[in-house]
Amino acid sequence: MRFSFSDEQLALRDATRDLLTKECTPAHLRDAWTNETGRVPGLWAQLDDMGILGMLAPESAGGLGLTFVDLVLVLEETGRFAVPEPVVETAAWGVPLLGRTDLTIAASEHWVPWADSADVIFTAAGRFERAGAELVARPSVDGARRLFEVQGTPSPVDGGEAIAAYDRGVCGIAAQQCGLADRMLDMTADYVRERRQFGVTVGSFQAVKHHLANARIALEFARPLVYRAAASIATRDPDTGVHVSMAKAKADAAAQQSARAALQCHGAIGYTTEYDLHLYLKRSWALARSWGNAKFHHDRVARAIL
């Protein structure tokens, strides 16, 4: 049995990274923090042109007919670049649920990011059509992830379908957390190789090495759980919910450890908004409290075990 990703899956990941390297730079993110939409102009269309948004839709509906294992690496890349678009909400949650690729989906339990640009909105209360919903802007620590409280009368969603969609969304967020952790550690490693103190690079100090090594270990323990959760979704494993919650809890912890290590090793400059680190730190903080926090997912795993 093969447990590694195929060449085609890795090629799609690399193509996504190439696109985002050019089209979702820190400069693009800074613009998204201050522009009217909170998004990168033109990026959504490019992701759609690549087929990313419809990867899980059947070919008969205009999708690629792929599985969540194919999608998870792409979602990890969208985390690495802190993409300010509802990719998880559309590609992982909404498209498989609705069987359509022509809609932009926003989803969350309560306050919903990017609800103002969606066609259909899902919350814990049910499904809202954008035209019939009232949106109330709410504060967000991440200026490119604008939140809205959705008010109106929702339509019910089938319980089984809602749970499956939720698990896909949670796994997608966990994958993004892995990408964010990787990005913050890479930025920090580059910084400590160049920053000099007492005549040497700060990366030569043992304490700095330990911070980054421990954070890297946490990330490498989280990744396999995310990939297993993706495989469970793809194969409809009866323990999918447990695997997804394990992945989210571990990925959140890894991202938060990477964030702490990044701040500690950067020092004062890491706290400034002029430096790019905060763009990724704040996204990881926001995602850790989205789609169920650590306590929720630990409890979900515990209930399945006990």
Show the residue positions of the predicted features.
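Alpha-helical interface subdomain recognition
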Residues: 1-81, 165-306
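FAD-binding core of flavoproteins
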Residues: 81-186, 190, 200
